[in-house]
Amino acid sequence: TLLKEEITVTGAGRTDSKVNAISYIAHFETTVPDLDAGAFGYKINAILPHGIVVHDILPASPEFHARFDARMREYKYFIHRRKDPFMEDYSCLYTFPLDVEKMNRAAALLMGKHDFSCFEKVGSDNKTSICTVSMARWEAYVPDHVRIMGYPASEEDYLVFTIRADRFLRNM
């Protein structure tokens, strides 16, 4: 091992398959004194699979827990309205008419503190199914590859739904 000791890495939570995590937080404990975070990060990235990268390693208090100390979690769901091979793995192609204004009115109903038990996996052992949603909205956006290559894009060719909450239930 890189640290010459057995460590356990604990992540902030689960992600479903085909879900990409950005700003994912994890923690581990080590007995290595004065760990050179930059050198350690370089070595970790050299052995991690291509699809995983560590951007920063920071010291934390011994009480810190990546999963239970998370203050919020955010998910983004992407829709593209026209054929775009660059978006296939990250976005859903949907070519039928959409009313973004109505979609945002519906999304607003998710805001606030609610019991989301109807969305959780049957048989879940959650202590509570109460979640507080602080943001839920649809927005038009232009992906980087479209902007860089100068492709023409209408206002609603690409949509993103962002939902932010203090927690999410499994399969929610």
Model-derived segments and spans:
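Structured-RNA-binding interfaces characteristic of tRNA pseudouridine synthases
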Residues: 2-172
